[in-house]
Amino acid sequence: MSKIHELSPELTNQIAAGEVIERPASVVKELCENSLDAGSKRIRIDFIDAGLKQITVQDNGSGIAKDQIDLAFTRHATSKIATERDLFNISTLGFRGEALASIAAVSHVEVTTSNDNLGGVRAIFSGSEKKLQEDAASPKGTKITVSDLFFNTPARLKYLRSERTEILKIVDIVNRLALGHPDVSFTLTNNGKVLLKTNGRDDLRQDIANIYGRQLAEKMNILKGKSPDFEISGLISDPNTTRSNRNFISLLLNGRYIKNYRLTQAIMAGYGNKLRPRRYPIAVVKIELDPLLVDVNVHPTKQEVRLSKEQELERLLTTSISEALEQNNQIDSGLNNLLAPKKSTNIDQLKFNLNKDVVNTARPVEFTPQVEPDQNAEVHETGANFVSLDQVRNDDKYVITSTWNDNVNQQVQLSPFDEEKDMQGKDDSIISSGDEILANNLPELTYMGQTKSYLIAHHEEDLYLIDQVNAYRRLAYDQILQDLNSENISQQGLLSPLILDFSNVDYLKLKENLENLQEFGLFLEDFGQNSLILRTYPMWLQPDAEKNVRMILDLYLNQTEHDISKLKAQIAGEITMRQSARRRMLNPVEAQELLKELRNSSDPYQDFEGKIIIIQLSENDLNKMFKKDE
């Protein structure tokens, strides 16, 4: 067995750095937190080549004294705590004294600092070893430049992701810091290009505008709540302005960005049932509490914490969010629903000015579902620039009219089993007793009648029940998917081009994928300032084109795998749900046409979500139900 021996300081520093410095974003986080703890009001972050080549953080904080430079780069040396008691009463972002030592262990570091305006010091470290220290002119504050990250631990480089991903992680870190400290001015640049700039005027709404876009910030609701132990403040979106993941929920505890599943669930609970499934609000929630109630000494990144009285905080969060939405008329009371007059909906009332000219119509005229308003539906007006992402909810507000059948494209692809006519009469191709038909070929059905919800038809001696809404959903889905897969997607011109604002993270992702988005008929152009411009849109996105464009971009941003076919299927499903049909009585001509179109669909037996469309009852099934076989 090998002898036990003490590790060298250089090796122990590299091991410790592995816990604290995982990637370039970790360096940015640690240096910015040090700047904030030093009382800085201006912080500038510049990085080159995703931070691997160089990261520079400069602030106007308290600075470091000349005689403490060596100590600052020594492990477990800090000015933030001194006793064991301090460990349970932490009011700063950092406290372990590991950051500078860990960074210097895996990079070349140059620091220029001054704790007054009379003079400063410049020092250079490389792999934990100090190479130089000299007097230097410097304003009050600190400037640290980190170069060649992981130069002496090249194995770490293979665990990093693409340059774009590393840039986005840096941007996300600085976004959270800026939201947690609106009184501090942040400037972030990559290769000289500004990615974020906040003014430090203690205006959270303005910072949200700088990060997520002005239109979104203007519609955020003020959040306030207080209990003997906690105080909550911030801004939250309305239930119709959502995203497909939790990344836009920022929990800021005493200025520290944290991740906490239970608190996130408490935020969701505050929205009640107003959120669509798998949709998440945009929220910046600041929580102030006594440091004695939180233990941040849990994880090296300090993003996971332990809370005392966590259930009390959860209740306060849920109640405060519910009250904030109700005060802003985002949650209707039962009394309001009873007394408020119902308005009729007119597609012409939507604030969306379209050019009547159609460009690039090199394909046959396509089917576009026609809708008429449900007389009991309430109007939801939407502003331009996609501020409200999902205001047209999946609540069956529209009724598909008879013009559906007149406009259906007759070139719908037939079932691949359509030629196998001889299978239609086989008993083993269909499951009876009220179960879903599993045969691959639907016979020609003859319409007989209709209840409110279902059509009744027959073929020979068999009876068929057809769910009207699910049948229409199948037809709509097939048509939209066919449009998506077309080589020449017809475009509708806009009288006024639409300018889409994004968070800086999403803007960077989309900007690099503008060509890929053309697969979905979206010809976007870079407009600068975290914005893209859209001059035309695909015809099949009507009537809610604005919201549908945002939905497509949202799905694209959050895809976990680059499967275009799968993404197109998701898009077709989302648009179909937004064009949801309401059950209505059909005349015999309409009903027979629906059965004909259903027979020619890609799957006449279930809709795109797997919901049953048609059930067959044979004469034997009916005899059993009436107990005629006993």
UniProtKB/Swiss-Prot annotation:
A GO cellular-component term linked to this record: mismatch repair complex
InterPro entries to which the protein is assigned, alphabetical: DNA_mismatch_repair_CS, DNA_mismatch_repair_MutL, DNA_mismatch_S5_2-like, HATPase_C_sf, MutL/Mlh/PMS, MutL/Mlh/Pms-like, MutL_C, MutL_C_dimsub
Pfam families: DNA_mis_repair, HATPase_c_3, MutL_C
Keyword annotations from UniProtKB, A to Z: DNA damage, DNA repair
One GO term (biological process): mismatch repair
Record GO terms (molecular function): ATP binding; ATP hydrolysis activity; ATP-dependent DNA damage sensor activity; mismatched DNA binding
Keyword flag DNA damage: yes
Lineage top rank: taxon: Bacteria
Family: Belongs to the DNA mismatch repair MutL/HexB family.
Record function comment: This protein is involved in the repair of mismatches in DNA. It is required for dam-dependent methyl-directed DNA mismatch repair. May act as a 'molecular matchmaker', a protein that promotes the formation of a stable complex between two or more DNA-binding proteins in an ATP-dependent manner without itself being part of a final effector complex.
NCBIfam families for the chain: mutl (TIGR00585)
Protein name per Swiss-Prot or TrEMBL: DNA mismatch repair protein MutL
Source species of the chain: Lactobacillus johnsonii (strain CNCM I-12250 / La1 / NCC 533)
